[in-house]
Amino acid sequence: MKTTLGIEFEPFFPQISHRAKIGCAKYDLSTGEGVAMEQWYLNMGEVPGTPLSQIVGIYSNVKPEDRECLKTSLSRLVHGETDHDQGEVRVKDGEGWKWVRLDIMEAGLEKSSPILLLMNYD
């Protein structure tokens, strides 16, 4: 049975992301440029619109011991030791620390184009 609602789902993605607290970002390691959904920033305790080059690899709002694990995961991806990593980190927000689950994976089709897909879930 074919549904004939005639609606596009893409316009609803920001609202779905916000309600489900799922964030997504795409980051080019070679240029330091990227884009992220507002919820990705919020989950990371960051101000929406901050250049990703000021967040990725720095993670100033991540608890120091978790930050080191996250940097190690990023390094493993950069050096081709893995194409995906996931884990949980504590992120500082206005009320203290919250747990955020992260998934980091290669998004580029070519190894010469180091593009990462960064997802997080609050």
Question: What are these language model-derived features?
Answer:
Residues Y41-L117:
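PAS-family sensory domains
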Residues K2-Y59, W99-G108:
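PAS-family sensory domain signal
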Residues C24, L116-N120:
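Sensory beta-sandwich core in regulatory modules of signaling proteins
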